[in-house]
Amino acid sequence: MAAELTSTKLNAENHLLLDQPLLRLPHELARRNFKSVQRLVEREREYVIPALKEAANASLSNAQTPDQTLAALDSMLARMQNLKRKMESIQQEEKKVQNQSRKRIQHLEHLHQIPSLADVKYDQWSRIRLDRLVVDHMLRSGYTESAQQLAQEKGIEDLVDLDVFVQCQRIAQSLRRGETKDALQWCNENKAALKKSQFNLEFELRLQQYIEMLRTGDRGKLMDAMAHAKRYLTPYTETQSKEIHRAAGLLAFPQDTKAEPYKLTDLQSMYSFDRWNYLSDLFIRTHHELLSLPSSPLLHIALSAGLSALKTPSCHSAYTSSSSNFLSTTTSVCPICSTELNELARNMPYAHHAKSYVESDPIVLPNGRIYGQQRLLDMSKKLGCVETGKVKDPTTGEIFDKSEMKKVYIM
């Protein structure tokens, strides 16, 4: 009885290892909002306090007319009102983030109130988490409308990061369309954080603008490209000198050049249109890094743990490939061998089995596969299409004579 209770006891801390991003993102958004307010206040303070002193001194010394003093005060009031509007907008975002954090903490707190895995409340909590993981996967895959609808139907809008991923996908799609405006605006809003990033997103975007200027072949654009490079690319000379030297070569080689490595057909060429897909992927990686989001969908991470517990050497053998062998019966019962999960599990480690369970009457077939004799005979009857005196391998579909079976002895 004690062993049974131990096996079903719920360890909340282990379960929450997968849910760290649930609280990490709201914390990151709150930190960014605080930094934004801090920058706004400091910028306005640096302007208003000196301007106020200057206006007061000028008024006392009669250096300006009353109308000029009023105009200066009106200008300062306008800036303060603009600051107030910006801070009110940030405050609304902050309230939303705090509400999300509260709902997420409550969701995780419910897990600590569940004593056993057999409790019906655990099934309910797990269902909510599964819905969250599915929505997360759909958002990362670009199915934003379906993800929003699912989150709304399940009532988990505060437990998923809809707005963050919608913005991410919108900017990523704009890059695939060949537009850099939204991505550069995002870089400007996150300039301070990008300085600590391992990716050089802004440099790559400015480089792409330079490439597009030269792609036209217009001589007028040539001068614009040179000015653009001087303004936006040269500041990266210390870290991106190799790429800048390659980019300088574009001034001598037009888009239709056959010279390596600038010709259009070369995938590594700066003229290649595949660079837009590269920029889109680079933006997504940078975005996730700045917001402390996992690079892989949480659903994949959760599945990987279970897949490694089920995986055996036969799951990816030449005989059980679900894509090449339609006779395989493992495709319907083994998650690893299923079409949907086969590739995801390919790089997973095999399950560690401390105990071995062996059939009492093992035999080996000519193809090297080992089964229990009685179970093989029963399975052959169930599969049908087997002549008398023959058996069918349930994994590969091959048919052999019973006389070809050899008894296996385990030492």
UniProtKB/Swiss-Prot annotation:
InterPro entries listed in its UniProt record: CRA_dom (IPR013144), CTLH/CRA (IPR024964), CTLH_C (IPR006595), Fyv10_fam (IPR045098), LisH (IPR006594), ZF_RING_GID (IPR044063)
GO MF annotation terms: ubiquitin protein ligase activity; zinc ion binding
Compartmental location: Cytoplasm; Nucleus
Name the UniProt record assigns to this protein: Protein fyv10
Domain LisH: 133-165
A single BP term in Gene Ontology: negative regulation of gluconeogenesis
Role played: Involved in the proteasome-dependent degradation of fructose-1,6-bisphosphatase.
Zn finger spans (RING-Gid-type): 334-396
Keywords: Cytoplasm, Metal-binding, Nucleus, Zinc, Zinc-finger
Signal sequence, renumbered to the chain: none
Organism: Aspergillus fumigatus (strain ATCC MYA-4609 / CBS 101355 / FGSC A1100 / Af293)
Protein family per UniProt: Belongs to the FYV10 family.
Pfam families in the cross-refs: CTLH
PROSITE patterns in UniProt: CTLH, LISH, ZF_RING_GID
Protein origin, superkingdom: Eukaryota
GO cellular component: cytoplasm; GID complex; nucleus
Domain CTLH: 171-228
